[in-house]
Amino acid sequence: MKPSLEDTLLASIRTIPDYPKPGILFRDITTLLGNARAFRRAIDELVHPYAGQKVDKIAGIEARGFILGGAVAHQLSAGFVPIRKKGKLPFDTVRVAYSLEYGLDEMEMHKDGVAPGEKVILVDDLIATGGTAEAAVKLLRQIGADILAACFVIDLPDLGGRAKLEALGVPVRTLIGFEGH
């Protein structure tokens, strides 16, 4: 019998205590990415609700969102658009500032990465507080994207990121939640 999605993900996501600082349980998806069956299953599950729908672009947040988003884009026959930290893209960009734990940062994308009205799915590995994903949503809306959903492998529900995106009217899809961060 095929293991459940939850069992597959639990067996292939490594938890590292006290990284990057004491008290944090870091959820490492590199072990998921290195397991061909688990990686394929995660991508298939992320894609499933959108198969047959018109999806123009997948926007992936640096860095693990590039890996997952590229695979999702391939499966949906959609283009891929990187959302990066400021100063990393070589052409004309649009930029948005967002709050970090200790200050501000900025992310950007190419101005011509998404045309107004194009249907976009935002992809990243994990949603925690939602600050980065919220900034990505604002960036995509700034250039006129129609955001169909935001998809993540992991949700840390105690940190409220999902609710933050849903309050912005963005449907959120996650594959597994870890209570307690």
Swiss-Prot record:
<dbReference type="InterPro" id="IPR050054">
    <property type="entry name" value="UPRTase/APRTase"/>
</dbReference>
<dbReference type="GO" id="GO:0044209">
    <property type="term" value="P:AMP salvage"/>
</dbReference>
<dbReference type="GO" id="GO:0003999">
    <property type="term" value="F:adenine phosphoribosyltransferase activity"/>
</dbReference>
<dbReference type="GO" id="GO:0006168">
    <property type="term" value="P:adenine salvage"/>
</dbReference>
<comment type="similarity">
    <text>Belongs to the purine/pyrimidine phosphoribosyltransferase family.</text>
</comment>
<dbReference type="InterPro" id="IPR005764">
    <property type="entry name" value="Ade_phspho_trans"/>
</dbReference>
<dbReference type="GO" id="GO:0006166">
    <property type="term" value="P:purine ribonucleoside salvage"/>
</dbReference>
<dbReference type="GO" id="GO:0016208">
    <property type="term" value="F:AMP binding"/>
</dbReference>
<dbReference type="GO" id="GO:0002055">
    <property type="term" value="F:adenine binding"/>
</dbReference>
<comment type="function">
    <text>Catalyzes a salvage reaction resulting in the formation of AMP, that is energically less costly than de novo synthesis.</text>
</comment>
<dbReference type="Pfam" id="PF00156">
    <property type="entry name" value="Pribosyltran"/>
</dbReference>
<dbReference type="InterPro" id="IPR000836">
    <property type="entry name" value="PRibTrfase_dom"/>
</dbReference>
<keyword id="KW-0808">Transferase</keyword>
<dbReference type="InterPro" id="IPR029057">
    <property type="entry name" value="PRTase-like"/>
</dbReference>
<comment type="subunit">
    <text>Homodimer.</text>
</comment>
<keyword id="KW-0963">Cytoplasm</keyword>
<protein>
    <recommendedName>
        <fullName>Adenine phosphoribosyltransferase</fullName>
        <ecNumber>2.4.2.7</ecNumber>
    </recommendedName>
</protein>
<keyword id="KW-0328">Glycosyltransferase</keyword>
<dbReference type="GO" id="GO:0005737">
    <property type="term" value="C:cytoplasm"/>
</dbReference>
<comment type="pathway">
    <text>Purine metabolism; AMP biosynthesis via salvage pathway; AMP from adenine: step 1/1.</text>
</comment>
<keyword id="KW-0660">Purine salvage</keyword>
